[in-house]
Swiss-Prot record:
Phenotype on disruption: Embryonically lethal before 10 dpc.
Name of this protein: Maestro heat-like repeat-containing protein family member 2B
An individual GO BP term: cell differentiation
Gene: Mroh2b
Cell location: Cytoplasm; Cytoplasmic vesicle, Secretory vesicle, Acrosome; Cell projection, Cilium, Flagellum
GO-annotated cellular components: acrosomal vesicle; cytoplasm; sperm flagellum; sperm midpiece
Expression sites (tissue/organ): Expressed strongly in round spermatids and fully mature spermatozoa. Expressed weakly in pachytene spermatocytes (at protein level). Isoform 2 is specifically expressed in the testis. Isoform 2 is expressed in pachytene spermatocytes and round spermatids. Isoform 3 is weakly expressed in testis.
Domain of life: Eukaryota
HEAT repeats: 123-160, 305-342, 401-441, 464-501, 526-543, 544-580, 658-695, 773-815, 960-997, 1017-1055, 1112-1150, 1153-1191, 1254-1291, 1295-1332, 1359-1379, 1380-1416
Role summary: May play a role in the process of sperm capacitation.
Keyword Cytoplasm tagged: yes
Alphabetical list of InterPro entries matching this protein: ARM-like, ARM-type_fold, HEAT_Maestro, HEAT_MROH2B-like, Maestro-like_HEAT, Maestro_heat-like_prot, MROH2B-like_N_HEAT
Residue spans crossing the bilayer: none
A Pfam family annotated for this UniProt entry: HEAT_Maestro
Amino acid sequence: MEEYGDMFGDINLTIGMLSKEDNISKEDIYCHLTSFIQNTDIMDDAIVQRLIYYTSKDMRDEEIPRELRMLAGEVLVSLAAHDFNSVMYEVQSNFRILELPNEFVVLALAELATSYVSQSIPFMMMTLLTMQTMLRLVEDENMRQTFCIALENFSKSIYKYVNHWKDFPYPKLDANRLSDKIFMLFRYIMEKWAPQASPMHALAIIKAHGPTVSLLLHREDFCEFALSQISWLLLQYRDKENDFYITQSLKQILTAAVLYDIALPKNLRRSVLSSLLHQICKVPEPPIKENKLEASSCFLILAHANPVDLLDFFDEQIRSTNEAVRTGILTLLRSTINAEEPKFRNHTTSIEKTVKLVMGDLSVKVRKSTLLLIQTMCEKGYIEAREGWPLIDYIFSQFAMSNRNLENPIKSNSQEDENGEKSVQETSLEVLKSLDPLVIGMPQVLWPRILTYVVPKEYTGTLDYLFNIIRILIMAEEKKKRDIQESTALVVSTGAVKLPSPQQLLARLLVISILASLGQLCGAGAIGLLKIMPEIIHPKLAEMWKTRMPALLQPLEGSNASIVLWETMLLQLLKESLWKISDVAWTSQLSRDFSLQMGSYSNSSMEKKFLWKALGTTLASCQDKDFVSSQINEFLVTPSLLGDHRQGTTSILGFCAENHLDIVLNVLKTFQDKEKFFVNRCKGIFSGKKSLTKTDLILIYGAVALHAPKQQLLARLDQDIMGQILLLYGQCCQILGVSVINKDMDLQMSFTRSITEVGIAVQDAEDQKFQFTYKEMLIGSMLDLIKDEPLNTLASPVRWKVLIAIRYLSKLKPALSLNDHLNILEENIRRLLPLPPLEKLKSQGETDKDRERIEFLYERSMDALGKLLRSMIWDNTDAQNCEEMFNLLRMWLVSQKQWERERAFQVTSKVLTKDVEAPQNFRIGSLLGLLAPHSCDTLPTIRQAATSSTIGLLCAKGICQEVDRLQGLQEGLDSEDEQVQIKISSKIAKIVCKFIPSEEIQVFLEETLDGLETLDPLCTKACGIWMIAALKEHGALLEDQLLEILSTIYHHMPVLRQKEESFQFMLEAISQIASFHMDAVVNNLLQKPLPFDRDTKTLWKALAENPASSGKLMRALIKKLVARLEDDIAGTEAISVACAIYEVILTGAHITHLYPELFTLLLKLVSCSLGQKMPMSTLSQRRRVMQLGERQRFPDPCRLSTATLKCLQAQAMREGLAKESDEGDNLWTLLSNPDTHHIGVCALARSMAVWQHGVILDIMEHLLSSLTSSSENYRITGMAFFSELMKEPILWKHGNLRDVLIFMDQNARDSNAILRQMAIRGLGNTACGAPHKVRKYKQMMLECIIRGLYHLARTEVVCESLKALKKILELLTERDINFYFKEIVLQTRTFFEDEQDDVRLTAISLFEDLATLTGRRWKIFFAEEVKKSMISFLLHLWDPNPKIGAACRDVLVICIPFLGLQELYGLLDHLLERDLPRARDFYRQLCMKLSKKNQEILWILHTHSFTFFTSSWEMIRSAAVKLTDAIILHLTKRYVELLDREQLTMRLQALRQDPCISVQRAAEATLQTLLRRCKEISIPL
């Protein structure tokens, strides 16, 4: 209900829009309303009433466009389905008496009358009365047309009521009253309006005429008037546009006349028939199709009403020679018969007579229409036995006539005439095709006269359907015989018809039967007739054919019957039939009838060729030798009787020789002796009659040999056959008695064919003892013929025929040697495969026929070559010989010329067919490698042939398990999509490679590698795929062949590198081998000289990148490296392994699990190779082009090892196992230098990712052995590494570093300074990693470290000791170091002036730490040491190294309290400022404070300053002079007097010459200060 409400809510909105003035929107609204009203079953009354109001209003509104008013009227009429009375009331209210209504009101009434007949009839009287009052008021043309439309609809409605009133739901009304009003309206219109009506008005009257007259005919009182109006209607046939409506009205009237059984007056009927026939047979302007159909319907109505009158009319009209009239009448007769009007069947004879009147008409249209009418008559049974035969004969005669006219056209014939004749011919065949011979009366008409059309040549084209008709008739008769057990012979009087003889029928049917092998219908029909009519041919044949025919028909059951097999079986049937008949006269007559039918077939037709063979077979079966001899002689003397004299005589004599060899040879010899060939040839030229030549006789002898009984043949072969052939050929090759090479193509072909047939005959004789003495000579002759053939054209079939001849000759004894086989095959291959491409060969032809012939010769020649190779290869039982012969094709299979390659593969595929069997030891590996990759060649023919050959190779070895699957895949290789080709080839490879013998894999790989070098890109890819597939399948079994395979692959590398894709496949092959034999491959690659060349590096990379081998590869290399470093000695092999590892890691191989072991091994290798040189024997011997001035660099083992370790660390960083070194890339330089190796190791150790403590612990475990290694370098490496690890707390926590600590204690005493240094560093770093261990082992550690302070020869050891002490002292108390304090302080002071910044800095910093650890016991001692050290701290405030300056400031701050000089703190704070104070100012302020506090310290500073005047650092010299200046300035008089002024002056004078200007100035200033002070206190200088 909700949907209902929504729907009507939308309608209300729509209706509301109708009140607007927008006409455009109204048009859309009315279209919508029409659809809505028609699709709605229930509508609200209020909505209906509103719609009636608006639609009626718009329909009558003159201001609205006509189209819109029409739409409104349609909506109004459609509303009647919901409320008819309201709609009718609305319309009637606007249809008032004596008041001219709106046009659309009238139209609405008319539409209501036809759409709602039942509801409209009760209102009809009122409507008609009102309309009657309006007619006189109508003046407008459009309004008159509207009233005519209304009259038409009202008449249709009343007519329906009159004839079907019982179906209406209310009591019967008085229809006469309604028809009275219609009569008055119609009469007024016809009298007043019709005479002056315009064309449009007239059309409206015509449309109303039929319904109105049809209605009036039911009233007897109106009948005469109504019929009188028909004449007016016929007179309107003037305008082509109106013809259809006139005929339509006429059809309505005729229908009503038949309904009310009203006979038309004769004259009127005649007029109607003439008018209607004119509508059908209009010539100038073809009738409109609809009008013609309506007129034909009118004729059907008239045929039903009075068939006699209609046929009389047709008989009268058809006698005219008018083509259109005759064609029209024949068409009308056909349609009338098709309508199966019962009354018409009684007039069959009249129809037949009418048809016979036009049988002589030569018009194509009339002939075709006649044939179609006869077809319909036959189908509907309108054929009578007495009169029917001429009609059947007409069908065949028309076919023959059209055939003659097409074969021998008149010159003036146009294309239209030719098309017409073809149309008649096709119609004749179509009539025969549809002819049902069992229709009532037809058997009597047809049998046996239908047989007369079997033999004549002109009816050959009808045999398809003729045989079927005869078969149906005979089978129907046979059925009758079985049903009633008595004969009801079909034979009736044949009249003047002459039936064919049994021999004629047999000859004709047997020859036509040969076409059954081609699937032709007439051939199947002929053999079918022979099967069912043996008694008609000869009574003796019934039983034999009954048993033989089923077997004979078996070959025809398949889709492709073999022509040769079918021909053989037919000839065998003929032989057996003639033997069964055993009647010499009957057989002789049959041979004559065969001869007489020679003209029925063309010379090139299959029927003619079979006829010759059948004739020869008949003569062979004839026992009358004189007759046979005479017939043969006649054919030899007058061969033109046979059509093609050569083929005819050859076939006939050949087949005749099967039973009459002696007769044939004798007649031939007699003819040959008597004939003068040259004279006969001249006569033939002038007379036009051809006679046999020597060439013809050569062919005949070959045919005789082929068909002769084999045992008789061998006895007469040499002298009577071969002797004659060679004699005739020799005579043909002589000019004036001199032998020359005859270039006559016909002679060469005839000779070759004859030799071939002789070879076949001898082979078929199967006499193993027979030695064919002419074999070698004939093969030589054949080779001479093929050698003479040009290599740029293929115009002759010589190659093809010679190849066939050689194939058969080669099989005969005596056998040929291998060299003979190879020479024969090579010569034939060289004469075919290098020919130009087929398209180029074809372009040499001038016509399409020439080009087709060239293509035919090409295909046949290639086929013959393939068969020759197949025969000669597989007939040999020696596998090696077979392979030798196959090798002849090798160069052609990989030819760069696409067409040569295609031919080679086509030949190979013919050699390797599935049914061949190879010798036992025949090897397929090499051939598979050669052939299989071409499954992706450029041409689909090559791809198919290559795959067929591959499958054939497997079958030849007896491997047939996967053949069906392979053939299924092969079909897809026709695709042009390269990806599809590769995919299919890959699938085939996976199957085929399983069957390659393992011992042949090496040669298979050699072939594929060659293919990778030489073939096109797609075949190259296929080579790679096949190679990989083979290795995957057989890789595990290749251990014995591994070295040879690898050597082969390496050999191809330089060339393959130039082809990227090929190179990648080769690398994948190595990887595949390695996945099975990793150790062997690794050993092989490690033997390559160092440094590895590009190819070797690429191989390592390939192995690493292959997922199947990468894991095994790294483990194998690690294993090798472990073995090579077992004695802590780095040999060349170990370096090779490192280089290999470098290439592997460089590919990004994951090393997480192998990293600890690999890292320690490589670090060990670096350590053990320090300072080594590469032995010359291991260096690569390849020469490298060097730039001018460049020196040859030899590889450094340590550098190579370091590079690998560097690569490892880079990968470790990527995997989060290590971090960037603080030394950067300098790390590796340090590491590979023997002098800095330990520094590099320390930096490397610092780059370890301590968060990966598990990894580092594994490294420590592997590296622990280094601490006890016999190699000093390795011990240093281990000690350096561990020294850095000692500072990591997490490693102390999880690892066992206590043992390492012990080793460090021991090594701290070692004679090797670097080892001692690293041990001391490790002890010092222990303070960071394990403070508790320092406190626990403080004595041991302090003693070791302090001992390092005495190693003055190696500053680095001292520096390391100072640093270690500083770290350790930070963890100890003054009590812990009490025993060592003095010694440490004294040793530390000795390094304040060390030249190395690091030592000075560490010493100063350590002194600072010592100050904090000074106990009560050592306080005075330390204060004295501070006084002594004060000069160093003050001067080094301006040390070149800023860090040292800062350290001096810090130590001064700490040490001042020991001297009681706290006043200096403020001064020292100035040193913390951003801008340092000037040294002179600082020193003067310092000295000023000291002078006030402690003059002794100033004096101590002065006494220690002299040593700094000679310092190597300019800044220190300058500072010392400035300090001296400040001291002099602030010394008291007593201390100034104590100065050694002479020495001081001398030293200052020397410094005035110092290279440094600042020193010079300071010295000058100090001298001036000295002079001034001396003056001040009156002391002489």
